[in-house]
């Protein structure tokens, strides 16, 4: 039985990682920033996996998303360390929102809408903040020439906030709507 549970977990990681990649690909056609980055829905499947399986599921799904982006060539990489920070680290840490796994599970069954909204928003905020930090560090170190005479760290933070703040808001709203209408998305079958 343990092998079956692990297999289901890995299949879910693969499916949600692929969905995250496709959502990122589709939303990037709406508009991409000049030095990379865009408003994206890719965090939604990563956080759903975190809500289903905890931090381990979220981190692994985020890592797979970064790996798929890199393998498929949908990246802006100027240096290996920048690529590692902007893709592997940034998307892996989105899964840290899975730290709210138990709270989200408890808020959804039975449904306590206020608590669910609070914990989903907190999870999305944590994942977004950590992703924002990874992108900001990479931007400050590897895209400094675009800052001109502005302080590099402030320029990088403002640049990355321009798409990360809307991404956080949109993903939070979508997650709340999805989970309040279909709690089976995160409840595991017994």
Model-derived segments and spans:
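Interfacial aromatic-anchored transmembrane helix boundaries in multi-pass membrane proteins
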Residues: 22-38, 64-100, 147
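Short helix-perturbing small/polar motifs within transmembrane alpha-helices
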Residues: 2-4, 8-22, 61, 81-140
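Alpha-helical transmembrane segments and their cytosolic interface
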Residues: 1-17, 122, 152-190
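Helix-boundary and loop/linker segments of multi-pass membrane transporters
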Residues: 3-6, 35-37, 72, 110-117, ...
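Hydrophobic alpha-helical membrane segments of integral membrane proteins
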Residues: 37, 122-128, 132-144, 158, ...
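Membrane-interfacial segments
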Residues: 27, 31, 72, 76, ...
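Alpha-helical transmembrane segments of multipass membrane proteins
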Residues: 20-24, 69, 93, 127-135, ...
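Hydrophobic transmembrane alpha-helices
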Residues: 1-52, 56-60
């Amino acid at each position: 039985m343990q092998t079956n549970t692990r297999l289901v977990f890995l299949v879910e990681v693969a499916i949600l990682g692929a969905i995250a990649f496709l959502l990122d690909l589709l939303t990037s056609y709406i508009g991409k920033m000049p030095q990379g980055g865009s408003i994206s829905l890719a965090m939604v499947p990563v956080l759903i996996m975190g809500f289903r399986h905890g931090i381990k599921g979220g981190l692994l799904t985020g890592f797979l998303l970064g790996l798929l982006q890199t393998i498929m060539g949908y990246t802006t990489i100027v240096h290996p360390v920048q690529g590692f920070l902007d893709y592997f680290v940034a998307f892996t840490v989105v899964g840290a929102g899975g730290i709210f796994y138990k709270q989200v599970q408890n808020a959804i069954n039975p449904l306590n809408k206020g608590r669910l909204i609070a914990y989903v928003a907190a999870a999305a905020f944590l994942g977004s903040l950590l992703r924002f930090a990874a992108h900001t560090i990479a931007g400050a170190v590897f895209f400094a020439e675009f800052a001109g005479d502005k302080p590099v760290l402030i320029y990088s933070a403002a640049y990355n906030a321009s798409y990360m703040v809307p991404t956080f808001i949109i993903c939070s709203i979508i997650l709340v709507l999805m989970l309040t209408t279909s709690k089976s998305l995160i409840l595991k079958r017994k």
